[in-house]
Amino acid sequence: MTERQAVILGAGMAGMACARILSRRGIDALLVAPPSDVASRGETLSFRAGPYLETLGWHGLLDAETALVNQGSYSVWGNRALRRGMFHQEEMSGWHIDRYRLEARMAETLEADGVDRVFCEARQFSRSETGIAVELADGSPVNTRLLVDCSGRSAVTAGPAVTLRRLDKLVACYSVFTLDEDVEAIPVTLVEAVAIGWWYTSLLPGSRMLVGLFTDSDLLPAGFRKNAGLWADLASQTTAISPRLSSLGMDLAAAPELHFAAASTVTASELVEPFIIRAGDAASALDPLAANGLATALWSGIQAAESVVGLLTQNDGTKAVQYQQQFLQGIASHLAVQTAMYASEHRFIDAPFWQRRRGPWLEN
């Protein structure tokens, strides 16, 4: 049976950040995650991620192939006027990223660091007085002192003692388009509120455009999942999204493929418990409207790693306790901002999507 000081489940940004720090601190850690099969997608990486990327030595991975500097955010929210910025927040430059490619670059640095990885899932866990036994999907067992769960929204270590609380049914319906060679698009983010939810567009590296509709899964029109024409029809009714797409020569009805991804707010009842620390979406997956999820993933991966170091080298759980407190405070702050964001849209107060978001979230 293999013995490891730490096992990390999941190779998203939180898991890889955790693995990077543990490797640098001389901790014998094993990264457990199957090969990524996520469809090509793009996301916004908040300026808040900058210091974490520097800490990890990853800031240099942001280049023309992986990231575009965001040149501004625009919104139609609260009324039909197009305005610069979102919800009176201070606007600072972030990045529009090709997440798949950026994470592949991050994985290459871990390989260069000598981080061990097995490309399969963890199937079963059993706790003892000294740690956790992990049974991998290939049948091999691993014993570890500490387990860091970065497995995403599934939070595979959750169970009867640690539950996942979902606050909504938000889902992202999106597609990525390749723009014609003669099209020049400015890398800006555009968000527009509509009765069924909200639209989002963002330019990606490689002259590609991501277009997404965020709504609740039970509010999707019948047949929506197999009919891009319905998606295009909804977009045609927007104030700013439709003109933006038309100016770029885009036809949503000709979407190469329509993808669906869970985007609901889900939080584990415990972020830290004996022998287990949760990070990234396994700790808390938050509404993407605030565009801060990836920065939080990097931060939590770093802090989870520092918690592991404290526990393993000094038998000191102080950092783990502080990590959980800071994360919970961040969740509460996010939910307060989230409630204010949705409350600032008054045009659709009778629509189910908006009625569900009148708050307070923790009492829903």
Which role does the model predict for each range below?
Residues M1-G12:
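Beta1/beta-strand and adjacent pyrophosphate-binding region of the FAD-binding site
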Residues G15:
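N-terminal Rossmann-fold NAD(P) dinucleotide-binding loop
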Residues S23-R41:
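Glycine-rich FAD pyrophosphate-binding loop
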Residues A39-Y74:
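N-terminal FAD cofactor-binding segment of flavoenzymes
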Residues H88-E108, P221-K226:
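Short beta-strand to alpha-helix junction loop
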Residues T109-R244:
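Predominantly flavin-linked oxidoreductase catalytic cores and closely associated redox partners
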Residues P141, F224-A304, T313, A320:
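FAD/FMN-dependent oxidoreductases across multiple families
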Residues E306-N364:
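C-terminal helical "tail/cap" subdomain of flavin- and related membrane-associated enzymes
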